[in-house]
Each structure stands twice: as C-alpha cells, then as structure tokens.
C-alpha cells in the first residue's frame, strides 16, 4: 500500500505541492490511480545489481549500472562517486568491495544532480539482510541545487530524513537496513521546489 491509500493528499502535501498537483492533470490522474490502488508501482530489483545486471524497470527509469566498487577499479571510474566515497569514509561509512550500485541523473528547471544507490548483503543467515545507501552528488554540466532534502521510508513510515542547506558544505546521504521482503521509497527535494519520487527498491 502507498500512503495515498491510507491518507488524503492534503495530509501529505504542503500548500505549494498541492497547488503544483492541481495545476497538472497528469499528476492528478496519477494520485487518483495510486489512491485507488488501480496500478502497481514499479519495483526496482536491486538484487539484480549483485550480478551486475539492471532489471527492466531500472533501465526504463534511466539508471546506469556502476562498475565494481572495489577500490582498484574505483580510481579509474569517471564521475564524482570516488569523492563521495572518500567523504563517506571520513565519516565512518565503509562501502565493502562486494557492494554494487547504480546512478540516475535527476534534472529540473534550475539544474540537476546525481542520485547514487549502493547496496550490499549484510548477512545470509536464515533472515538475510541488505544495506541500501543513497547518496546525492553533482552531475556533469549541471548546476547543483543549493539545498537538498532526502527522505527514505518503508511502507508505513519515514525512516530517515536528512537535509543540507548548502550543498557546498558537504554531501547528503542516508542508509537503511532491510530484509529481502522490505521495500524502500526515496524522495528528494531540490531547492524546496522540485520533488523527485523514486520508485521503490
């Protein structure tokens, strides 16, 4: 179930978001379908990433598989994830060599940024768990948003909400642990105006 099936839109949206919604017939139709449960939300299968494959949903949404995150290959990887990884390491976040990930460029009227999703298996016991790390970085040839907000939630509640009032001062990231049956939804807000809802992992 999505939150639209248990709550009214005005309980979930700000006045500004509600105004944007009402001015866009496609969004109104989408909210109606989500609230009535008349369509299935696409699900990104990050388990495929462990085998260096992208599922059809991820491909359609513009996700690009990253090369192995082993340190030896990381140095030659283009983009800014190596910088993000260094900053995460300095904050005590260690990404294991067996981790796999993908990125997706998100753009809006005033600029754009890159969303990285990294996952790895924590345990393969009778109740296996996996880690999902979401990090936001700059996108080549795009103006980075001045402010960013990142929310990760499961089917019932927000799990992590992080905000960065000045993207020049650091990076925004969140990590959650789940079992194989859990799904996580990602919402990113750029400059308090552009809202990106990422289909669940």
Say what each PLM segment does.
Residues 93-201:
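C-terminal, beta-strand-rich globular interaction domains
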Residues 1-107:
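Long, hydrophobic alpha/beta structural blocks
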